[in-house]
Amino acid sequence: PGPYNHYFDKQIGIYKFLELFKNEKNRKARLEHCFAFCEPGKKAVVFSGGGTGTIAYEARGNLGRWHDKFYIPDGETKTLSELREIDYEKEASYWGDAKDQFARWYKNKKEVSFKSKFHF
């Protein structure tokens, strides 16, 4: 999870993580990207998106966080880190549309709030 990336990387790191998977035949994985929004006194609204892929046998690429270096999205042969080096927009698309979901929701929320305040 996002808030624990640095801690996980420091405690375990890519190479120890991949070592745990060295004999694993099922290397399927899911990358989930979530955003949450919460106003005081209200219930949080969560937006998520992502995709499926596989865990590589070795770390590849130089950009991104630890998981970017071994996660290969379905339909690709390169890790997210390698894709980012070549085409940032393509790499970003594999994170899903959680940010877009949030933006649409927030924009609509603000429009509704404005209209209700001014009785449109």
Give residue spans per PLM region.
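Anionic-ligand binding patches
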Residues: 1-120
